[in-house]
C-alpha cells in the first residue's frame, strides 16, 4: 500500500512540474516600443503618488520662517494678482468636451501628423497653446519636466542641466513646492522656468471656469509669496483639457504648454534602463519638439546627459520656452 501511495505522489509531482513548464512557455514578453500616443499621465500609479503626497504634504523645514522679508530664493515677494474670470458661465458656448492630448510617435526627425494637427487646432482657434514649434526654421527643441511629486531625482536632473548649460521648464504642483522647496529654489535661481501645474492636479475640463481660475491662482499666489517668482506658462494636469479650458487659461495670461515628444516614463515600477530612455527620446526627436519627461523617472535622470549630447551632435539646440515666438 505504501508503495502504491509513493508511486501516486511521484506521478503527481511530475505532472505539476510539467504544468509549470507549460505555463511558462505561454508567457510572452512585449519588447515592442511603447506606442501610447495620448496623455502620459493617464496611468493610475502616477496619480496615486500625487494624491498620496498631497494627503501627507507638509511644508519642508527649509520652507519655514526665513525670519526676513525675503523669500526662499532671496527675492522679494511678488504682489498677488486678482485674476478676473471672463464669461464665467461660458455663455459663448465654447466646447467643454474632454480632449486627452495626443501627440503621436515622431519618426525620422519628422513630427507626427497628430502633433502638427494639434498645433493647427490651437492656432485656428486663437488659443495661447504650444505643442510643436512650427515657426522656427532651425533645429530647436524645448525640454520640459512634469514634477507631480518628488522621487529623489530632481536634484540629479538639475545637476545635469547645469553641467550641460541647458534651460528647461518644470511644471510643479503646490504640494511639490511645499515638500521640496530646495529644488524649486534651484530651478528659479539657475534660470529655469517653473510652470503652473495647478494646486490639486485636477482634470481641468471637469471644473467650472471659476474653479479653474482658483486652481491656477492658488499656485500663483504660493509661488509669488514664498519664492518671489511667477511665470506665464501652464500645463494641464494629465494632459486633459477642453476648448473652454484653453480659452480660460489663455484669458488669464498663460500659454498652455503641451508636448510633441514623450514616452511612458512615469511608472517608477516599470523603468527600463537609461539606454532605453536615451534611444526612445532620440528616435523620436524632431525640429520644434516640445519634449516632456517626468522627473520621477530614474531612467530619465540617468540618461539625460547622453540625450543632450546626442541631440547636440545631431545639430539640435536646446532653447527656453521664453525664446519661442508664436
Language model: regions and residue ranges:
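Short acidic donor-binding/metal-coordinating loop in glycosyltransferase active sites
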Residues: 145-147, 295-296
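Catalytic grooves of carbohydrate-active enzymes
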Residues: 285-322
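C-terminal motif of bacterial Sec signal peptides marking the signal peptidase cleavage site
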Residues: 15-19
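Metal-dependent polysaccharide deacetylase catalytic core of the NodB/CE4 family, i.e.
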Residues: 139-141, 151-158, 162-292
Amino acid at each position: 500500500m505504501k508503495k502504491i501511495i509513493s508511486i501516486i505522489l511521484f506521478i503527481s509531482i511530475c505532472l505539476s512540474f510539467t504544468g509549470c513548464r507549460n505555463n511558462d512557455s505561454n508567457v510572452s514578453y512585449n519588447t515592442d516600443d511603447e506606442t501610447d500616443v495620448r496623455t502620459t499621465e493617464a496611468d493610475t500609479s502616477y496619480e496615486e503618488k500625487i494624491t498620496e503626497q498631497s494627503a501627507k504634504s507638509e511644508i519642508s523645514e527649509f520652507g519655514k520662517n526665513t525670519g526676513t522679508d525675503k523669500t526662499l530664493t532671496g527675492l522679494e515677494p511678488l504682489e498677488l494678482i486678482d485674476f478676473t474670470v471672463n464669461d464665467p458661465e461660458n455663455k459663448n458656448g465654447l466646447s467643454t468636451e474632454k480632449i486627452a492630448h495626443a501627440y503621436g510617435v515622431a519618426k525620422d526627425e519628422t513630427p507626427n501628423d497628430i502633433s502638427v494637427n494639434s498645433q493647427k487646432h490651437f492656432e485656428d482657434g486663437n488659443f495661447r497653446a504650444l505643442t510643436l514649434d512650427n515657426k522656427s526654421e532651425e533645429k530647436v527643441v524645448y525640454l520640459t519636466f512634469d514634477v507631480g511629486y518628488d522621487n529623489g531625482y530632481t536634484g540629479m536632473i538639475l545637476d545635469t542641466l547645469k553641467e550641460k548649460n541647458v534651460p528647461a521648464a518644470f511644471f510643479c504642483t503646490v504640494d511639490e513646492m511645499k515638500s521640496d522647496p530646495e529644488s524649486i529654489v534651484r530651478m528659479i535661481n539657475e534660470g529655469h522656468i517653473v510652470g503652473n501645474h495647478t494646486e490639486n492636479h485636477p482634470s481641468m475640463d471637469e471644473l467650472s471656469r471659476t474653479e479653474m481660475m482658483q486652481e491656477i491662482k492658488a499656485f500663483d499666489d504660493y509661488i509669488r509669496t514664498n519664492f518671489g517668482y511667477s511665470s506665464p506658462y501652464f500645463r494641464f494636469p494629465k494632459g486633459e483639457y477642453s476648448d473652454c479650458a484653453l480659452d480660460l487659461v489663455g484669458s488669464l495670461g498663460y500659454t498652455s504648454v503641451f508636448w510633441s515628444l514623450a514616452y511612458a516614463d512615469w511608472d517608477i515600477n516599470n523603468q527600463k534602463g537609461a539606454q532605453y530612455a536615451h534611444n526612445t527620446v532620440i528616435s523620436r526627436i524632431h525640429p520644434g519638439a516640445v519634449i516632456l519627461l517626468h522627473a520621477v523617472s530614474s531612467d530619465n535622470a540617468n540618461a539625460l546627459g547622453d540625450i543632450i549630447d546626442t541631440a547636440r551632435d545631431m545639430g539640435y539646440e536646446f532653447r527656453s520656452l521664453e525664446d519661442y515666438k508664436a
